[in-house]
Design a protein with these regions (language model features):
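Short catalytic micro-motifs in class I SAM-dependent methyltransferases
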Residues: 1-5
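Non-membrane alpha-helical structural segments and their capping/turn regions in soluble enzymes
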Residues: 6, 10, 123-126
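Conserved catalytic/acceptor-binding region of the Class I
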Residues: 10-11, 17-94
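Hydrophobic alpha-helical core bundles mediating ligand binding, dimerization, or RNAP-core interactions
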Residues: 40-47, 71-74, 78, 104-107, ...
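Core SAM-dependent methyltransferase catalytic element
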Residues: 81-83, 104-107, 146-164
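C-terminal helical/coil "lid" or tail adjacent to the Rossmann-like core of SAM-dependent
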Residues: 86-140
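C-terminal alpha-helical interaction module
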Residues: 134-135, 141-142, 146-151
């Protein structure tokens, strides 16, 4: 998910294009569609609502370039820069199954918002996540689904120039 944090993004992508060798491949994992993974939005909302109770302005500024967070805007940007390369986006949903307690702790780490909390508030958040996972568990196990997109850029020509 490193590409998600890059800002400014355009110089990063242009540098990647410049150093990409003939038949070379650049790949990145970026955010997926929030609605494509069962339960993801609920977990997202639990975490962000909790953090915003403590830090009301949290989320007003995003980390990285916001164009990476939307497949439509990222696709447009990548096609503009890598116009003479093969570009593919593949959606994925990563699934994790574990006991509610373990899953609550592990899942919180996928969200930067949880990292701004004090130890005391973090434990309260984990407790809220555990309660959510307790309600959705089957045979003692709960599931967390994480949406992601895999970007793959392949340089298919000997000259993959920077300027069009």
């Amino acid at each position: 998910w490193a590409l998600t944090l890059m800002d400014p993004l355009v110089p990063v992508l242009k540098t990647i294009k410049r150093i990409l060798k003939n038949k070379g491949v650049f790949s990145a994992i970026v955010d997926g569609d929030l609605h494509s993974a069962t339960g993801y939005l609920e977990i997202h909302n639990i975490i962000y609502k909790f953090v915003q109770k403590i830090f009301p302005n949290y989320g007003l500024l995003e980390l990285g370039d916001p164009r990476v967070r939307s497949l439509k805007t990222l696709d447009k940007l990548v096609k503009k820069i890598f116009y003479d390369c093969e570009i593919n986006f593949t959606p994925h949903v990563l699934s994790f199954k574990q006991t509610p307690e373990v899953l609550a702790r592990e899942v919180s780490g996928f969200f930067y918002a949880s990292l701004v909390l004090s130890s005391k508030h973090y434990e309260i958040l984990v407790s809220e996540l555990k309660d959510y996972f307790d309600k959705t568990s089957v045979d003692g196990l709960s599931e967390f689904n994480l949406p992601a997109n895999r970007l793959v850029v392949k340089k298919i020509s000997k000259v993959c120039s920077l300027e069009k």
